[in-house]
Amino acid sequence: MLAYQARVKEEYDQLMLKINALSKFLESAKFLTVSAVEQELLLSQFISMKSYAECLEKRIAQFK
């Protein structure tokens, strides 16, 4: 694996940790305690992060 490929894989792994943490928060009762604007922004962030993860997955698949 080339150095840049390892960096992409590491970036993906870190992103997935953040996605999983945010997903748990979005499903928690604490999510309902933040403002509606903040909820909307968090959901938008989650969708964007998932889209970015899908892009990284496709790049990683091309490494093989």
UniProtKB/Swiss-Prot annotation:
<dbReference type="Pfam" id="PF21825">
    <property type="entry name" value="crAss001_48"/>
</dbReference>
<dbReference type="InterPro" id="IPR054052">
    <property type="entry name" value="Y16Q-like"/>
</dbReference>
<protein>
    <recommendedName>
        <fullName>Uncharacterized 7.5 kDa protein in denB-rIIB intergenic region</fullName>
    </recommendedName>
</protein>
